[in-house]
């Protein structure tokens, strides 16, 4: 049995110490890291509870329950940040990526502790794939919210649409992994390629301007 709350405390403790040492300017980054890991911790409990209540099998829990719960949990601290502080567009994007990155980091650490780290090639691909998938979902939600929250009439509809897009991408990723074989490695490679393609497109657009 993996006591993920103990892992959470061990990972958050140095972040809290660093946050106190770095000052107010860097405090936001550490708080979003902690929020992302906390969202991952709560997602694990909620996923387990809903899977038990719905009597879902492993595939249903992975492809139907987990993407919805995890993306909603990642969105909550971001919405709180938007409602309370009303940040600028770039700060929204940075916050979403930080939450997604810390979520993926905590998830990978728990996976390693539970399943071991003896298969380097598999762990390597999974680490990059899972991290890129969560970051890609963060880019979709964060970049979209930076646009939609500047327009009052788009806030609710835009947020729901972005959440739906992130959930769909997340579910496709889990379905490919659940299928196994070559599809599993396609799932790991796809988010990395999409992030790289998006970054390249943004770079080219910046050069044209």
Pin down the residues of each PLM region.
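Hydrophobic alpha-helical segments at protein termini of multi-pass membrane proteins
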Residues: 1-209
